[in-house]
């Protein structure tokens, strides 16, 4: 019998963090080795235990709120992080960074726990965030920068009709993660 999954995207906020804090930490800790190559916050030095992980997540929520206030004042870029929930449990995260009301695009990022790989959780989440981007934010395209060795993410983006736009050599993964690598930039024009 085919079992159906309920995949939801919930905006990351204080109440969600409070309700699912232990679930967040469990998923992060179980996937730390895989995630720390791509996300600086997954490193044991940044989030070594439950309380420091939750404090980091609270700081992230505050930073997101600050960027949204700044956006309203100065029409500047902002972020929108979401928690991927599968059957009411944390399955990963997906979000939009550098949402630009001027160029009508944003950078998409995502990760799912190892136990949720191969179940189309990332694919369904990408479709949901594309719908949100188009219908709620009036964006016209999304792009993703992927470490060249991250075969899963490249495959997921390709299956979702993202195409390679650029390759950058010998660059840091992000401004917060100085690890030098090669990045592949994917882009998708989103339409109704």
Predicted regions and their residues:
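Acyl-donor (CoA/ACP) binding surface of acyl/acetyltransferases
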Residues: 1-23, 27-34, 81-192
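Generic hydrophobic, aliphatic-rich segments that mediate packing or membrane embedding
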Residues: 61, 65, 78-80, 92
């Amino acid at each position: 019998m085919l079992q159906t999954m309920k995949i939801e995207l919930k905006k990351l906020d204080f109440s969600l963090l409070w309700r699912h804090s232990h679930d967040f930490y469990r998923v992060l800790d179980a996937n730390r080795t895989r995630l720390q190559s791509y996300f600086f916050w997954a490193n044991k030095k940044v989030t070594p235990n439950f309380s420091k992980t939750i404090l980091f997540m609270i700081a992230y929520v505050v930073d997101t709120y600050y960027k949204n206030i700044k956006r309203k004042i100065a029409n500047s870029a902002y972020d929108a992080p979401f928690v991927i929930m599968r059957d009411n449990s944390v399955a990963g995260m997906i979000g939009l960074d550098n949402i630009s009301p001027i160029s009508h695009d944003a950078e998409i990022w995502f990760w799912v726990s190892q136990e949720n790989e191969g179940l189309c959780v990332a694919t369904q989440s990408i479709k949901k965030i594309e719908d949100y981007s188009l219908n709620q934010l009036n964006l016209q395209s999304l792009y993703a920068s992927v470490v060249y060795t991250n075969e899963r993410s490249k495959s997921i983006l390709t299956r979702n009709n993202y195409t390679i736009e650029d390759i950058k050599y010998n660059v840091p993964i992000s401004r917060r993660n100085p690890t030098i690598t090669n990045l592949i930039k994917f882009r998708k024009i989103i339409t109704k």
